[in-house]
Amino acid sequence: MEFTKKFLRAKSPCADGFRWFSRNVEDGTGYQEALDTLVNAGRVEDACWLLAQFGPTSAVLAVDALEAEAIVFAGTVEVRGSIDVATVIQAGRSIRAGGGLRAGRAIVAGEDIRVSGSIISQGTLQAGGDVRADWGVEAEGGIACAGDLRAGWDVVCHGALQLKGGGFVGQDLIAHGLVECGKGLRVGGHLTGAESLRVGQGIVVGGAITGVAHLEAGWGIKAGECIHTQGAIKAGESLCAGGEICAGPGYGVYAGLNVQQETWEASAQVWSRERPEGLRSGMWLGASPLHPEIDRSRACVMPSPQ
């Protein structure tokens, strides 16, 4: 693909960007060359806009290691070692690294992001496909993923966590913003939230679920320890906790919202150490059969109000 002023004008660029492009990029310049020219001139946002307008290519950038101020590449970025970018890395297709991936402002891929180390963004993290890290994932901003999110260690998200697929976290999930997951959510350790958490399918957490505002799952919810929320707890099918199930003051606990009442005994079971206060639907059956004896020293305690 070669660029001309007429070709670019058809995309309705801003006046300042078009003037700069006209003066600094010759007609007939290649697509990636134009992106590189913009990035090298510090016009990273213009390069990202250009990529959004003209889309990805099949080109591959393959290097041993990558360290730069910014990277905007129309194809796939493949790095045998680590990627360290001061501001933005954006790829039209996938980003793959044999080590870790770090960016100071944003990490964006049109398709998958797969790394053998950790993913750290001091801004946002966005992928048009799956995000997979053998170690942990941390973003100071939001995480938006059109596929699945998989991390071997912790996932820490300081903004909204939005997954169209499922979430699979080997250790703890710490979310400071809204969490929305189109499929299931599985966490090996604890799940700590601050705002509401909604999952289209089921939730399985090895430890405790705490801090969340409203908790909602289309299927069942299972936690190895307690489930404590600030708001309501809603499960389409059964609820199971190794400790207590506690909704926020004035809110209810609901199981079996997506099944008929006649099937509650099988499909809307509620298992917890004590009958949840405010249980509005479902059938409480006692302590979880998976945790017949709970060490009270590990019991969840609601944090004191600040």
Kindly label every feature range from the protein language model.
Residues 1-306:
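Short, glycine-biased loop/turn motifs at secondary-structure junctions and
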